[in-house]
Amino acid sequence: MPRVEIEINPVNRITTDAIGPPGKRVFYILAENDEQTVTLIAEKFQIQSLSAGIEQFLVEIAGKFPELQEASPDYDQDVMEIKPPVDPLFRLTDIGLGYNADEDMVILVIHELMPDGTEEEPGIVRIWCTRSQLRALGHWGIEVVNRGRPICPQCGQPEEPEGHFCVKKNGGHKRN
């Protein structure tokens, strides 16, 4: 049996955000309805992957169900931002997406990252949302990820405000 098992069906709000300065940000996924709020810690690459996966997933749904109205990507930044303090339930390891055609609802199934050697079954959170809520989450996720440190055009690594050691420029360069 999972260490923790939560289902939010449906959510009033689902979002992701990063708190902290670029280079030291902590990424979160938050889901809430009138009864509960669940916050989970994620990695930047997980938010990037989720955002890309959401768009691909919604395109697949539209292909299977062409009669459905297109999901809106619109969001209100004030609603999408996560305000500290946050109390994360756990750090996530993976996210799965599913679709219930009868209800026209999407489910995110999120599993907990457990330390090596732990015998407990990982926690699981199931979040039900509309296709438009999911698409807004994906678009906002891209916005959040892109707010980080700029990427060096030479080596593809993040740049610090004071510059960085760039192997392709033989040592480094300062930002203007």
Named regions from a protein language model:
Residues 40-42, 110-163:
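Mixed-charge, glycine-accented linear interaction segment located at domain edges/termini
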Residues 25-31, 50, 54, 106-110, ...:
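Short, structured motif recognition centered on aromatic/hydrophobic residues
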Residues 163-170:
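Short cysteine/histidine-rich zinc-coordinating motifs and their immediately flanking basic loops
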Residues 1-52, 56, 60:
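The feature marks the first
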Residues 1-21, 68-124:
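Intrinsic, low-complexity N-terminal interaction/targeting segments
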Residues 37-41, 49, 55-60, 64-77, ...:
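N-terminal pre-domain and mature-chain start segments
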Residues 172-176:
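Short microdomains enriched in Cys/His and/or Lys/Arg
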Residues 13, 26-28, 39, 94, ...:
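Beta-strand-rich binding-surface signature
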